[in-house]
Amino acid sequence: LFWLLLLLALLNLVVYIETPSRYIFFINLLISIFTFAFFLYFFRNPAREVEVDDENLIIAPADGRVVVIEPVEEYEFFEGKKMMQISIFMSVLSVHANWIPLSGTVKYVRHYKGRHIAAYLPKSSHENEHSSVVIENANGIQIMMRQIAGALARRIVTYVAENTSCNINEHLGFIKFGSRVDLFIPMESEIFVDLGEATIGNETIIA
């Protein structure tokens, strides 16, 4: 955002110097202000805190809407183990910051290049560019979170590293533009969200 602000400032300076009409300058200035405000809104990264009295609770990692709740066989890390998949679709207007869903230790981090088809499609989970993170808590519960790029998203940022500790209330990463997050959690987990339900990152209890 700093470089965008600098670029817009330089552009307006050039227009101010080179254009005799102040009308054109003010139009350009208004467009620049609108552009910067849009990017400032889109890349917002709010600080949120949640208090939980159960270290096994899994918190929503993202703002969005639940589009998948189904049992699956997970092969990337869990070698075909049956797990419950919960997917959250993030629209272009959603906050695109991602939070840690479970306090514990990061056991696995991988980034995969791929396609950029619409993130709400089921096959996007495997075919699109994505990053996978596995977290294990103090009680041995393991979950996987997968950040998935969408049709517009072209960059996934993951802040955590393997063999480091992580805690809820901390940011896990960021996905730029419309995208999706998949959670793979133990089959025996009690699910507290329904299909179509809106989630708030680092606030909504998933399981």
Where are these regions (language model features)?
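Contiguous, well-folded functional domains in the mature portion of proteins
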Residues: L1-A207
